[in-house]
């Protein structure tokens, strides 16, 4: 530790800390434009100048490390004069168009001009004009406002791993630009909007729609993937105007994906507002009572409870999943499947039940056991059947962050992917995994030397008919590596669905496994209840009676005989469990449109009509039930600590097909019903396909 004096206050700081960090430690905020705690130090705006004893001139506090007994002064006439001079130079070419700038009210330049700026200018020449750049459908550029802090350049290069932004020209002609008019091709591009201290980079979808002081904010989480990024929903009236990231060091730091940030316009399109039934091939809007009675009538025609099937969608909350499971159990069915692991639902005589994972009673068999914040402790990474850049962009940034620290290697088994760090592909062949498990592959030597290896298994593995066997094969590595020790667990299942871990916590762990031969016998009519399931494909769907409960008119609604309008994640207070097992809550920002209701309330009302009444009249009743079956679901923003059990790996006896892994999805922007209803996401999809 080093002792320094800031404006006469003594403070101890870590050796190597900067003057700016020392000032922050005693509560003195130093003005800055280019400095950001998550980016490398540039030191090019000079706004953070301070006076240091025995220094001939002011120094940049963001770049100067402290020394023992250093005396720092932040509020002297020299410092004020220096900051005023720097600000005057920054305003020389600034257009001063605050009334029409979307950054107004949230602009660092605006705020600091109020403190250090003058009421008149001394520059009487023509201001420099800079042509605006087209860097994609999400980020609007007004480059005349740019002050060359280079935050966007450093973010793109260091965090996003996409060096598309840079500086061109020199001196007065310096500009921030892309290479030969290329778009900024990153899943995290929207974060440069938050980083920009002026109005040079703003949101295209949000442009000219609202001012920050008109908005009401609600703290919530994102459900577009299984990371559970913390977000802030800004609303005016009953319309979402924008979504911003919320700081959570343990989950998303302060970044969010473009899908989380910009898909919100899909929440006002293709919405289901009223119950609908299909009679004689025609859809009719009806009351809730008539829709429930129509379900009861058709359910009574199903004589065998084995013909009652439920599918849990990717965006569903834990409370609704619990009631859904209990309702189907009361109807005599245990056939409840996860949409994320059952891409195709075939109903035939050759079907048989199986578990997604063996030992699903133990939580560490189906979650990512390495907390996101501890990924930086790993010293080697093996990716199996996953394109982590598309399936979990914020997990990808964590791995890239560790990669940039050095002495880190990333290997993959599966298709070759364009990740944001160097990856050695070991092949897309099951025989490669077999060689690794038997210790015959050259990679095994590196794996054995690793003290804290990280293994990440993708969702595509769970969708394979031999997925359970592949996971058990990977577990045989425990016997000669340190993947799982008394103080480290590097075994991770990467889910891509926000509902998967919560559903598995509630015991919904079965999926469909089929024999190779498909039966030609007549398919009996099934009662299929889709709870927000829009990604699943049902063979011979016209032969069955299908109930769809959800919020968008997507695939599920198109094949349904009854449509029950539910609430989106922005319209309900609900519980979700992320990929690492962390329990988090969404908060209602406004009411659902029309006659749509919260999903758990719909299931509760339906149970009464079906004479299978569920004993839950309030949210508190459901949480009381959690206390007895899964008490960890009540511990918000916490990960239930699981005792690390070192398994005695048995010889592998499973059957695995020698078929390579396939991409889970190729289009990052259209992975759920909300995104597919979003015009912004559609633009992204079409533009980035061409690039």
Curated annotation (Swiss-Prot):
GO biological process: ATP synthesis coupled electron transport
Cofactor: [2Fe-2S] cluster; [4Fe-4S] cluster
GO cellular component: mitochondrial inner membrane
GO MF annotations, alphabetized: 2 iron, 2 sulfur cluster binding; 4 iron, 4 sulfur cluster binding; metal ion binding; NADH dehydrogenase (ubiquinone) activity
Main localization (coarse): mitochondrion
Binding site for [4Fe-4S] cluster 2: 146, 149, 152, 196
UniProt binding sites for [4Fe-4S] cluster 1: 94, 98, 101, 107
Organism listed in the record: Reclinomonas americana
Functional summary from the UniProt entry: Core subunit of the mitochondrial membrane respiratory chain NADH dehydrogenase (Complex I) that is believed to belong to the minimal assembly required for catalysis. Complex I functions in the transfer of electrons from NADH to the respiratory chain. The immediate electron acceptor for the enzyme is believed to be ubiquinone. This is the largest subunit of complex I and it is a component of the iron-sulfur (IP) fragment of the enzyme. It may form part of the active site crevice where NADH is oxidized.
Cofactor binding, per record: Binds 1 [2Fe-2S] cluster per subunit. Binds 2 [4Fe-4S] clusters per subunit.
Residue numbers binding [2Fe-2S] cluster: 34, 45, 48, 62
Domain named 4Fe-4S His(Cys)3-ligated-type: residues: 78-117
Gene field: NAD11
Catalytic activity: a ubiquinone + NADH + 5 H(+)(in) = a ubiquinol + NAD(+) + 4 H(+)(out)
Record localization: Mitochondrion inner membrane
Listed name of the protein: NADH-ubiquinone oxidoreductase 75 kDa subunit
InterPro entries, per database record: 2Fe-2S_ferredoxin-like_sf (IPR036010), 2Fe-2S_ferredoxin-type (IPR001041), Mopterin_OxRdtase (IPR006656), Mopterin_OxRdtase_4Fe-4S_dom (IPR006963), NADH_UbQ_OxRdtase_75kDa_su_CS (IPR000283), NADH_UbQ_OxRdtase_ferredoxin (IPR054351), NADH_UbQ_OxRdtase_Gsu (IPR010228), NADH_UbQ_OxRdtase_Gsu_4Fe4S-bd (IPR019574)
NCBIfam families (alphabetical): NuoG
Domain 2Fe-2S ferredoxin-type span(s) in chain numbering: 1-78
Enzyme class name: translocase
Keyword terms: 2Fe-2S, 4Fe-4S, Electron transport, Iron, Iron-sulfur, Membrane, Metal-binding, Mitochondrion, Mitochondrion inner membrane, NAD, Oxidoreductase, Respiratory chain, Translocase, Transport, Ubiquinone
Family: Belongs to the complex I 75 kDa subunit family.
Record text on subunit structure and interactions: Complex I is composed of about 30 different subunits.
Lineage: Eukaryota, Discoba, Jakobida, Histionina, Histionidae
């Amino acid at each position: 530790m080093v002792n320094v004096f800031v404006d006469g206050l003594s403070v101890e700081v870590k050796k190597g800390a900067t003057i700016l960090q020392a000032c922050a430690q005693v509560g003195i905020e130093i003005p800055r434009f280019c400095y950001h705690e998550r980016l490398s130090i540039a030191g090019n705006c000079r706004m953070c100048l301070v006076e240091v004893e025995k220094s001939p001139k002011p120094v940049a506090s963001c770049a100067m490390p402290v020394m023992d007994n250093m005396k720092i002064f932040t509020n002297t006439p020299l410092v004020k004069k220096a900051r005023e001079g720097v600000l005057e130079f920054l305003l020389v070419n600034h257009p001063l168009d605050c009334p029409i700038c979307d950054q107004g009210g949230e602009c660092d330049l605006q705020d600091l001009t109020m403190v250090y700026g003058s009421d008149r200018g001394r520059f009487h020449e023509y201001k420099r004009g800079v042509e605006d750049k087209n860097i994609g459908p999400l980020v609007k550029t007004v480059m005349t406002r740019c002050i060359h802090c280079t935050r966007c350049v450093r973010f793109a290069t260091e965090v996003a791993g996409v060096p598309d932004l840079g500086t061109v020209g020199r001196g007065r002609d310096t500009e921030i630009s892309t290479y030969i008019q290329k778009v900024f091709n990153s899943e995290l591009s929207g974060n440069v909007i938050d980083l920009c201290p002026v109005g040079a980079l703003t949101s295209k979808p949000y442009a000219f729609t609202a001012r920050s002081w008109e908005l009401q904010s609600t703290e919530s989480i994102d459900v577009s993937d299984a990371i559970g990024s913390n977000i802030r929903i800004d609303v005016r009236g009953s319309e979402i105007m924008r979504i911003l990231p919320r700081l959570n060091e343990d989950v998303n730091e302060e970044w969010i994906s473009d899908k989380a940030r910009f898909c919100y316009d899909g929440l006002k399109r293709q919405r289901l507002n009223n119950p609908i039934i299909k009679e004689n091939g025609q859809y009719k809007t009806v009351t809730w009572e008539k829709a429930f009675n129509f379900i009861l009538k058709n359910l009574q025609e199903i004589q065998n409870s084995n013909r009652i099937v439920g599918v849990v969608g990717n965006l569903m909350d834990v409370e609704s999943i619990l009631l859904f499971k209990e309702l189907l159990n009361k109807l005599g069915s245990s056939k409840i499947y996860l949409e994320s692991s059952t891409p195709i639902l075939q109903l035939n005589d050759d079907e048989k039940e199986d578990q997604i994972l063996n030992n699903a009673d133990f939580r560490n068999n189906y979650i990512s056991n390495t907390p996101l914040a501890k990924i930086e402790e790993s010293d080697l990474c093996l990716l199996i059947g996953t394109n982590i850049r598309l399936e979990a962009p914020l997990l990808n940034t964590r791995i890239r962050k560790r990669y940039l620290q050095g002495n880190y290697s990333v290997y993959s088994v599966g298709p070759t992917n364009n990740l944001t760090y160097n990856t050695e592909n070991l092949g897309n062949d099951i025989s490669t995994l077999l060689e690794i498990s038997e210790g015959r592959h050259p990679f095994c030597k590196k794996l054995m030397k690793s003290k804290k290896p990280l293994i990440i298994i993708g969702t595509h593995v769970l969708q394979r008919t031999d997925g359970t066997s592949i996971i058990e094969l990977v577990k045989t590595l425990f016997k000669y590596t340190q993947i799982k020790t008394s103080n480290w667990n590097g075994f991770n299942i990467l889910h891509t669905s926000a509902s998967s871990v919560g559903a598995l916590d509630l015991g919904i762990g079965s999926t469909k496994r089929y024999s190779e031969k498909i039966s030609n016998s007549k398919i009996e009519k099934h009662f299929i209840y889709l709870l927000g399931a829009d990604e699943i494909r049902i063979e011979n769907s016209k032969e069955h009676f299908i109930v769809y409960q959800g919020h968008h008119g997507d695939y599920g609604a198109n094949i349904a005989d009854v449509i029950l309008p539910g609430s989106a994640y922005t319209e309900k207070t609900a519980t979700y469990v992320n990929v690492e097992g962390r329990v988090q809550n969404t908060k209602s920002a406004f009411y659902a449109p029309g006659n749509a209701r919260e999903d758990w309330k719909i299931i509760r009302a339906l149970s009464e009509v079906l004479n299978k009444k569920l004993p839950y009249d309030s949210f508190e009743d459901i949480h009381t039930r959690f206390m007895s079956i899964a008490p960890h679901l009540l511990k918000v923003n916490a990960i239930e600590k699981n005792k690390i059990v070192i398994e005695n790996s048995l010889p592998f006896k499973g059957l695995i097909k020698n078929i390579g892994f396939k991409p889970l999805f190729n289009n990052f922007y259209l992975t759920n019903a909300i995104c597919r209803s979003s015009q912004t996401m559609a633009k992204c999809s079409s533009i980035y396909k061409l690039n």
